[in-house]
Amino acid sequence: MPHFTVVPVDGPRRGDYDNLEGLSWVDYGERAEREDPDGHGNHRESSPFLCPLEASRGSDYYDRNLALFEEELDIRPKVSSLLGKLVSYTNLTQGAKEHEEAESGEGTRRRAAKAPSMGTLMGVYLPCLQNIFGVILFLRLTWMVGTAGVLQALLIVLICCCCTLLTAISMSAIATNGVVPAGGSYFMISRSLGPEFGGAVGLCFYLGTTFAAAMYILGAIEILLTYIAPPAAIFYPSGTHDTSNATLNNMRVYGTVFLSFMTLVVFVGVKYVNKFASLFLACVIISILSIYAGGIKSMFDPPVFPVCMLGNRTLSRDQFDICAKTTMVDNETVATRLWSFFCHSPNLTTDSCDPYFLLNNVTEIPGIPGAAAGVLQENLWSAYLEKGEVVEKRGLPSTDAVGLKENLPLYVVADIATSFTVLVGIFFPSVTGIMAGSNRSGDLRDAQKSIPVGTILAIVTTSLVYFSSVVLFGACIEGVVLRDKYGDGVSRNLVVGTLAWPSPWVIVVGSFFSTCGAGLQSLTGAPRLLQAIAKDNIIPFLRVFGHGKANGEPTWALLLTALIAELGILIASLDMVAPILSMFFLMCYLFVNLACAVQTLLRTPNWRPRFKYYHWALSFLGMSLCLALMFVSSWYYALVAMLIAGMIYKYIEYQGAEKEWGDGIRGLSLSAARYALLRLEEGPPHTKNWRPQLLVLLKLDEDLHVKYPRLLTFASQLKAGKGLTIVGSVIQGSFLESYGEAQAAEQTIKNMMKIEKVKGFCQVVVASKVREGLAHLIQSCGLGGMRHNSVVLGWPYGWRQSEDPRAWKTFIDTVRCTTAAHLALLVPKNIAFYPSNHERYLEGHIDVWWIVHDGGMLMLLPFLLRQHKVWRKCRMRIFTVAQMDDNSIQMKKDLAVFLYHLRLEAEVEVVEMHNSDISAYTYERTLMMEQRSQMLRQMRLTKTEREREAQLVKDRHSALRLESLYSDEEDEAAAGADKIQMTWTRDKYMTEPWDPSHTPDNFRELVHIKPDQSNVRRMHTAVKLNEVIVTRSHDARLVLLNMPGPPKNSEGDENYMEFLEVLTEGLERVLLVRGGGREVITIYS
């Protein structure tokens, strides 16, 4: 499945957030600056909703079915138009795009990207196999089995494979938590842990990959000079003690030549490396199959590789041909070359012979007894050796004697001191390479599926091969041959090759080409990793390595990689380079596990991996295992690697990397104090870190009791976002006089918060007007980065029955304030019917009606609610609306793909709303609304007596300073005969008798009023949408719905309230949602 990014919709680019997340950033400031010709934003039909500029943009804005949302369709686009632009793939990381734009000046250059087409097998499984199987399997596994014994060798393999398996589980969780663009492992680590950790670990990963190239080259040289062409050696030992020096010098010279040639190949074109990758992989697979074939054959026909023993000591067979002290030539006993070596004379004299040679017999034993010979029992136990110690076979008769030191090269001796920890460090590189699949994330058709399946299958496959190989080697090969690292005792044959069928050359040639191929792959991957780090510009002095050839090949990074690899070549010992490699990879794997554990424990809203088989305890175990392996294998290397990583971390921190990648470490700042608050001041949170920080505006009754406690219940059920919760209320009056009431109200709210298990803060303000107090709360609540980004506002019940317009004016003014402050708004309607924390919905649906795109709040809120036990069993359904010209089938497919990448499980349904004529009911409903509004307006203008009476009522109630949240004086309406009949219909108008002499002229005009056409269209939208929603969602546990924006001028406020009432009529529980002008959910990891 392709990767998706959402492109900006009809608007200019506004910085990095648009580039990264792809969705248009709503700038209300710019909207405010676009004034209309009449100065009031009025439509030519005197509509308070639609301005002439928008009306001229085409039929989209005159769509009858969406007329209620038409004012903001330019910044909150229809879902149908948004889904049509989803499928726009890019395989560039954010840093790469920034770097590319910086180089091109205007930032307009874009490369055409091929559609990713690789599946799990070719894209992840086989590359991982090729990278995991390598030089250690062919050159060191037999030696490890002979030295550690089968049991301890199995333990080493188990520990190392468990480490990589746990890391792969963590990596799978991170990789499936959104689209991973090209950049693979480094991208995942850096975007999960932040620029400091990301840069440190990225460089460690780079150094590990670079030293891997050196290790593979050294392995190829060892195979070449030891088994393929020994005469090609340039340096030869000048004495008995110069053997190792000559070997190391040969490795350095040939290693440098090989490295130069491979660097040239990579420089000329990486396409040649990719072409030969399949050939190299075939070599690996054929070599492994030949080992198994040889093991099976050895059960009934073991190969002939005799080993010459002097007493119980193993002799180096490459220096003599006959395994005997004497031989018969022409019926005459003559000394063999072996006698000449130990006695320093061709004569059969014993004067100068080695004492051990004289006292012990020379015997010949089979090097490959076969699986049926029972050597497994002998090879179960360890036989660790010190450097220079002779390889001996337990059980053979031997007479101890002090041998001559100069004869030591005639024996097979240990070249290094061995122990369990040393073998762990040497073997661990043979299980690395698990990142090969994630490194190709940009080429995968469905990375979220392929990376976990392919990587874990590759680890399971290689682990089974390693386990079976350990048992096979222990069961088929003689112990002294296993401990013979270079095959000196079997005539300088590759030990694993002696077991292979049909010929040892299959393994020798196959391993040579596979190690060369692995070296080329490392030299190809490491420069690209360095280039990605350099393009992110988190380490300034590395920026030069972000540049390359015209086609993007990292020339300078390749040069630096070759220089660092040369340092590994100069070490010249495979056994010395392998632990260095282990340190850097273990460091990388440690931080992958740390990233997964941090994200899981923080439970950020964006942490929604499709891979479900992870747990923070597994990640923590993997992290602990990586740390333990680092110190077990080589504690001083571990300290050096950690010191390097620490220095890089502090350097990046000192330089002040101005990067915000939505990393998990920033999430920890929410639980810290001053230091965290200062860091949170640096800028707005990344979309991946966005969580609802709620400001809940409560209404108190006259006794200072919370009027709607279910608002707090609802806030507590959103606590899965792990965000901030502030509960606010307003006391009307003077602060000096009402301070005590404010304190009492605050205590009441805190008690209710405790009952409803809301963890947060309470703030009560005193203001002369309630709407001013609400504006103060919206502006000033919070501290630094700990500020609210969402407002929970109750619905103004009874607004129709109140003759005072302030009953709904305060509500609409608060909506406008949240919009101006770029805050999200949640309006739960019928809050009394919302469930308490003790209820459980065992079934049912949470329905989302996604009509216009508003930043993704509609998708995120149900996900957070379903984390709570009340809503956990509910299923999520997403409905969107298709018009006549929309392809509803394609919309459904696109929406399903989009939700797949958002990692949200939901049923998708596209509801077709065809353009229909405006019904008589809609016309009548609009007429009723406008008559009522006009009547109230005329009464307020002409009935001075009623105004005077209302003023008296207000004066009588001025002592009550506690005021409603949504109206300044909602309950001050006078009772009695003067009360106005608010429900005004044409029928009532016709049936009630009236006297024209007592009716103002303006009131006589009400019967002749014609409804405004824009209002008719909006009412049509509300009625049609309500019909569809009630039909589909009448049994839903909760309905989430886009909240239309308020009118631009205040004359349409009452009509706006009526539209909202009609839109939500007949629904038991409704949550009206209005985004804050920024994205809150993303497909990226």
Curated annotation (Swiss-Prot):
ATP binds at L697, K699, K707, Y708, V730, G794, W795, Y797. The modification Phosphothreonine is found at T983. The modification Phosphoserine is found at S24, S47, S59, S81, S88, S734, S916, S967, S1050. Residues 665-681 are annotated as: Scissor helix. The chain crosses the membrane at residues 120-141, 150-172, 197-225, 249-271, 272-297, 420-440, 451-473, 505-531, 555-575, 576-598, 613-635, 636-651. Residues 1-119, 173-196, 441-450, 532-554, 599-612, 652-1085 are cytoplasmic. Chloride 1 binds at G433, I434, M435, Y589. N-glycosylated. Phosphorylated, phosphorylation may regulate transporter activity. K(+) binds at N131, I132, Y216, P429, T432. Residues 28-46 have a biased composition (Basic and acidic residues). It is a multi-pass membrane protein. It catalyses: K(+)(in) + chloride(in) = K(+)(out) + chloride(out). Keywords: ATP-binding, Cell membrane, Chloride, Disulfide bond, Glycoprotein, Ion transport, Membrane, Metal-binding, Nucleotide-binding, Phosphoprotein, Potassium, Potassium transport, Symport, Transmembrane, Transmembrane helix, Transport. One of its GO terms (cellular component) is synapse. It is found in: Cell membrane. Residues 142-149, 226-248, 298-419, 474-504 are extracellular. Homodimer; adopts a domain-swap conformation at the scissor helices connecting the transmembrane domain and C-terminal domain. Heterodimer with other K-Cl cotransporters. This is Solute carrier family 12 member 4. The lineage of its organism: Eukaryota, Metazoa, Chordata, Craniata, Vertebrata. The gene is SLC12A4.
